[in-house]
Regions:
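Charged, low-complexity interaction regions
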Residues: 22-25, 88-90
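Solenoid-repeat scaffolds in large eukaryotic assemblies
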Residues: 27-28, 34
Length: 112
């Protein structure tokens, strides 16, 4: 897949630890941070003339809305931006680290 920009591996590791400890909220934060760091440090798609937003949630929303991305990548980005309900539950089953790795894998392959 290639080498990640600085901080991506650390955020994924923190997210894995949080998820294992049952802290899905922190795992989601780490998953999103990892994607943001990757985009900031590496990925500049030739197919996108507009610059990437600075905010990671906006980056994920852009991926979700962009039909140039495969549907599974777009759905993973959507899950990572979906708000947790007041009862701390998601409207669908989720593994934020698996979603992050799916998006990261696609972005890394797109730059190869």
């Amino acid at each position: 897949m290639g080498q990640f920009p600085e901080g991506v591996d650390q955020e994924l590791a923190r997210g894995d630890a949080a998820f294992t400890a049952g802290n899905e909220g922190m795992a989601r934060v780490c998953a999103r941070r990892a994607i943001g760091l990757l985009i900031d440090g590496l990925w500049t798609p030739a197919s996108h003339a507009a610059p990437w937003p600075r905010d990671t949630l906006h980056k994920l929303r852009r991926i979700h809305e962009d039909e140039a991305f495969p549907i599974e990548v777009r759905q993973a980005a959507q899950r990572l931006t979906t708000k947790v309900t007041q009862q701390d539950t998601m409207p669908f089953p989720t593994d934020p680290l698996a979603d992050a790795r799916l998006v990261i894998r696609h972005l890394m392959n797109d730059t190869a």
